[in-house]
C-alpha cells in the first residue's frame, strides 16, 4: 500500500516531465511508465541524501581525541554547544553555471553576510541616512546654543538635523552602470511638538532636496572607473565634525562632474556647478538674480609616506551678468559682484592603532574669505543664505586647521579640532567693509573607554576673535565651554562611528560679546544645561 501511494505521489510530481515527453509516453505501457517514474524517484532521493550527508558532516563536531575544557569559573565547558538559537554560518545557493555538475556539486556555500550583500546588490537599492535628536533643559529656561562652530557641539546643540539618501541602480551591464540618487535634508524642531513643515515657528522646521542626480560608470573611455554625474549635486564636502562646519563645500543647484578619476598616483574630482544669488541694493529692499558658476578641482589621495595622503584643491566662482544687472550695480546702488576663489591643501595621516589626523591650509579672497571670519559657522560659502550684500575689495584670508582622534593606550581616546584664521581688508557682517580679523578656536575631547559600548569624558572648548573695522576700532568675542558626558556607542571611535547616545552636563560662558551682543535667557552671560542626545547614521 505504501509503495502504491509513493508511486502515485511521484506521478503527480513528475507530471510536467510526462507532459513534455508526451509523444514518447504514448508508446509506453502503464507498467513501463511506472518503472521510469520509480527510477527517477530513486535518483532524486539519492541526490537529496547525498547533500544531507554532506551538510551533516559540515556541522557534526569531531569526537576523536577530544579533551574537556573548563571555563573561567572552573566548570567544564559544553563540548557540543547548542546551535539552534544561533544564526547559521552559511547558506547553500544553487550554481547556475552549465558545468557546475561536472565540478562535483550544483550547490556552493555562502555566508549570511555575503548572501545579504548579494541580495542588496541584486536589487540595486540602498537607503542611507543621518539624524540627531534629543532632550535638554537649562538653568535659565529654554537652553540656547552659542558659537557651536568655535566651542564644539557636545551639550551645545539643540537641533534635529537629518539627511536621507535614496539610491537606485537602473542599469549594470557590459561594464556600464547607472544610478539615480536623491538626497533629502532639513531640520525638525526640538522645541514645539507641532513640527509641521511650513508652520515654521522659530524657523526650525524645513526640508529640501539637496541632491537629485544621475551618476554613471564606464561611459567615459578615458576614465572608465570614475563616477560621472549630472544633476543637482556638488563636489564632496569635508567637515570639521566637532565644530559642525566644512572646510570644503561647494553648494550647487545643478551641475556636471567627475569623481575618483585615477590620474597618476592620485585621483581627480572636478565639478562645474551653478548657484544663482540674490544681489541686493544698499537699502536691502530690492534685489536682482545673478547667474553664477563655480569650477571646483581637487587632486586627492596622493600617497606621501606610510598611511599619509595629500590633497590639493582649487575653486573659482564667477558671474554671468546681463547688461541690466551691471547697470543696476553701476547706477542704482546694487552691490557689485566680485569673483572669488579659494586654494589650499590638506594632509591626512592615519595611525597604526587606529585614528587619524587631518591638517589643512586654505587661502581665499572676497566673499569666501569673509566666511573664514565667522566664529559661529565658517563654511566657505559665497553668500549668506543665497543673499549677496557686501562691498568686496580683493581682501584675503588664511585658515589653518587640525582635526582628528588618537588612541592612548587601551582605554583612552582624544579627539581634537583646532583652527587659526586671519584676514585683511575683508567684508564682515559685524564690522563692515575693510575689516581685519584674527581668531583661534580649540576643542579637545578626551574620554575613558570602558568597553566597546561605553565611554566617559569631557569636551573642553575655547575661542577668541578680534575684528578691527575701517576706523581701527576693535571688537572682541570670546568664550568657553565645559561638557561632561557619558556615551553609549557601538564602536570606540569618536569621529567615525555611530550610533552614539550622549548624556551630558554643560557649562558655557560668554566672556566677551562685542560682535553679536549675544545673551542667554534673562540676559545672562552663562548657562548650565543637562540633556540627552542621540546621533545615528546608517
Swiss-Prot record:
Classification via InterPro entries: G_neg_Bact_CarbUptk_Porin, LamB-type_porin_N_dom, Porin_LamB, Porin_LamB_sf
Coarse class of the protein's main subcellular location: membrane
Keyword Repressor: no
Domain of life: Bacteria
GO MF term (any one): carbohydrate transmembrane transporter activity
CDD domains: Maltoporin-like (cd01346)
Topology of this chain in the membrane: Multi-pass membrane protein
N-terminal signal peptide: 1-25
Coiled-coil region list: none
Biased composition (Polar residues): 62-73
Family: Belongs to the porin LamB (TC 1.B.3) family.
Summary of the function given for this chain in its UniProt record: May be a sugar porin with a broad carbohydrate specificity.
Protein's name according to its UniProt entry: Putative outer membrane porin BglH
Biological source species: Shigella flexneri serotype 5b (strain 8401)
Gene: bglH
Amino acid at each position: 500500500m505504501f509503495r502504491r501511494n509513493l508511486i502515485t505521489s511521484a506521478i503527480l510530481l513528475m507530471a510536467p516531465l510526462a507532459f513534455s515527453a508526451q509523444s514518447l509516453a504514448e508508446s509506453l505501457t502503464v507498467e513501463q511508465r511506472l518503472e521510469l517514474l520509480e527510477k527517477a524517484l530513486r535518483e532524486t532521493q539519492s541526490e537529496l541524501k547525498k547533500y544531507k550527508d554532506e551538510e551533516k558532516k559540515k556541522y557534526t563536531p569531531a569526537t576523536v581525541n577530544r579533551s574537556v575544557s573548563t571555563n573561567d569559573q572552573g566548570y567544564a565547558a559544553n563540548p557540543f554547544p547548542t546551535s539552534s538559537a544561533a544564526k547559521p554560518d552559511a547558506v547553500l545557493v544553487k550554481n547556475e553555471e552549465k558545468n557546475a555538475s561536472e565540478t562535483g556539486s550544483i550547490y556552493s556555500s555562502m555566508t549570511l553576510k555575503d548572501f545579504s550583500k548579494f541580495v542588496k546588490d541584486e536589487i540595486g537599492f540602498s537607503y542611507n541616512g543621518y539624524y540627531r535628536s534629543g532632550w535638554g533643559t537649562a538653568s535659565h529656561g529654554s537652553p540656547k546654543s552659542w558659537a557651536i562652530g568655535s566651542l564644539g557641539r557636545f551639550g551645545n546643540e539643540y537641533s534635529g538635523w537629518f539627511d536621507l539618501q535614496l539610491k537606485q541602480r537602473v542599469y549594470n551591464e557590459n561594464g556600464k552602470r547607472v544610478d539615480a540618487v536623491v538626497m533629502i535634508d532639513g531640520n525638525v524642531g526640538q522645541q514645539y511638538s507641532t513640527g509641521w513643515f511650513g508652520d515654521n515657528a522659530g524657523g526650525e522646521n524645513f526640508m529640501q532636496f539637496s541632491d537629485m542626480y544621475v551618476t554613471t560608470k564606464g561611459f567615459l573611455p578615458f576614465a572608465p572607473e570614475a563616477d560621472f554625474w549630472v544633476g543637482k549635486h556638488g563636489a564632496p564636502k569635508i567637515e570639521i565634525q566637532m565644530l559642525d562646519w566644512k572646510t570644503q563645500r561647494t553648494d550647487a543647484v545643478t551641475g556636471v562632474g567627475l569623481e575618483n578619476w585615477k590620474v597618476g598616483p592620485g585621483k581627480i574630482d572636478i565639478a562645474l556647478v551653478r548657484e544663482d544669488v540674490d544681489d541686493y541694493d544698499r537699502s536691502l529692499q530690492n534685489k536682482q538674480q545673478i547667474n553664477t558658476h563655480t569650477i571646483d578641482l581637487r587632486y586627492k589621495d596622493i600617497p606621501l609616506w606610510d598611511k599619509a595622503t595629500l590633497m590639493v584643491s582649487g575653486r573659482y566662482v564667477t558671474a554671468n551678468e546681463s547688461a541690466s544687472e551691471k547697470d543696476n550695480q553701476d547706477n542704482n546702488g546694487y552691490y557689485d559682484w566680485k569673483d572669488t576663489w579659494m586654494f589650499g591643501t590638506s594632509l591626512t595621516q592615519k595611525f597604526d592603532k587606529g585614528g587619524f589626523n587631518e591638517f589643512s591650509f586654505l587661502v581665499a579672497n572676497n566673499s569666501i574669505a569673509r566666511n573664514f571670519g565667522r566664529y559661529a559657522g565658517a563654511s566657505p560659502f559665497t553668500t549668506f543664505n543665497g543673499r549677496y550684500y557686501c562691498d568686496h575689495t580683493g581682501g584675503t584670508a588664511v585658515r589653518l586647521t587640525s582635526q582628528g582622534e588618537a588612541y592612548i593606550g587601551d582605554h583612552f581616546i582624544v579627539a581634537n579640532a583646532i583652527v587659526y584664521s586671519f584676514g585683511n581688508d575683508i567684508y564682515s557682517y559685524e564690522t563692515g567693509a575693510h575689516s581685519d580679523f584674527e581668531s583661534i578656536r580649540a576643542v579637545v575631547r578626551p574620554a575613558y573607554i570602558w568597553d566597546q559600548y561605553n565611554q566617559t569624558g569631557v569636551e573642553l572648548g575655547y575661542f577668541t576673535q578680534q575684528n578691527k573695522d575701517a576706523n581701527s576700532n576693535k571688537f572682541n568675542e570670546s568664550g568657553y565651554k565645559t561638557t561632561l558626558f557619558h556615551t553609549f556607542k557601538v564602536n570606540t571611535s569618536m569621529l567615525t562611528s555611530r550610533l552614539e547616545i550622549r548624556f551630558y552636563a554643560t557649562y558655557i560662558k560668554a566672556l566677551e560679546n562685542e560682535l553679536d551682543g549675544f545673551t542667554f535667557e534673562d540676559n545672562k552671560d552663562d548657562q548650565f544645561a543637562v540633556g540627552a542626545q542621540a546621533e545615528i547614521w546608517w
